[in-house]
A protein has these predicted regions:
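Gly/Pro-rich cap/lid or specificity-loop segments adjacent to the active site
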Residues: 2-145
Length: 145
């Protein structure tokens, strides 16, 4: 896991976290992919003690929103949580899948096999990997659209 230094935008503190995860959890030492999560906190000095709330973008194919201000549901969530904006595998700053990257995987059969690793079951496994690094042994909550 690699984490950025905290940085601020008006009313918010952000920390970017990068992780490596197996492309195929049945072969954990094989090919790895990148996962990206942005931690969003309010400016309360005790915010680092709050539990995590993971935001799951409704997708498919969309990155997590980039917070630019503390309004709406995010404002409410930050009263109780640190929010993780999770770019699921295949999207955003995580290893992405698009027509260009898919073309690098070979023929149609190889491309289809590659895409089998970008389903919800692996997105959940990735989330658990992230949880094990950011808050080992602690539960977290989820929200999505």
């Amino acid at each position: 896991m690699n984490s950025s230094d905290p940085y601020r935008i008006p009313g918010l503190e952000l920390i970017d976290h990068a992780f490596e995860a197996p492309l195929d959890y049945l072969d954990p030492r094989g090919r790895q992919i990148d996962l990206f999560v942005r931690e969003v906190r309010d400016l309360d000095p005790k915010s680092s003690e709050k539990p995590f709330l993971v935001f799951l973008q409704g997708g498919p194919g969309f990155r997590a929103p980039i917070p630019i201000q503390k309004t709406g549901w995010l404002k409410r969530a930050l009263t109780e949580y640190r929010v993780l904006m999770y770019d699921t595998r295949g999207n955003g700053l995580s290893t992405s899948v698009d027509h260009q990257t898919l073309g690098l995987e070979g023929d149609a059969a190889a491309q289809a096999e590659y895409l089998t690793h970008f389903r919800q079951d692996n997105i959940v496994r990735d989330a658990e990997l992230i949880r094990s690094k950011l808050s080992p042994g602690m539960p977290w909550s989820t929200i999505g659209q």
